[in-house]
Amino acid sequence: MTITSTQVYIALLTALIPAFFALKLGKELSK
């Protein structure tokens, strides 16, 4: 099974988007 750059990009997005929202939510709650 070969990993293409597109699959890496999608994997990064799926990892980063929830992390970004969690960070944004955490900043809102700490105010």
UniProtKB/Swiss-Prot annotation:
Superkingdom, taxonomy of origin: Eukaryota
Lipid bilayer topology: Single-pass membrane protein
Keyword annotations: Chloroplast, Membrane, Photosynthesis, Photosystem I, Plastid, Thylakoid, Transmembrane, Transmembrane helix
Pfam families named among the record's database cross-references: PsaM (PF07465)
GO cellular component: chloroplast thylakoid membrane; photosystem I
Subcellular location, record wording: Plastid, Chloroplast thylakoid membrane
GO biological process: photosynthesis
SUPFAM superfamilies, sorted: Subunit XII of photosystem I reaction centre, PsaM
Claim: Chloroplast is one of the keywords in the record: yes
Protein family according to the UniProt entry: Belongs to the PsaM family.
Protein's recorded name: Photosystem I reaction center subunit XII
Organism (species): Euglena viridis (Cercaria viridis)
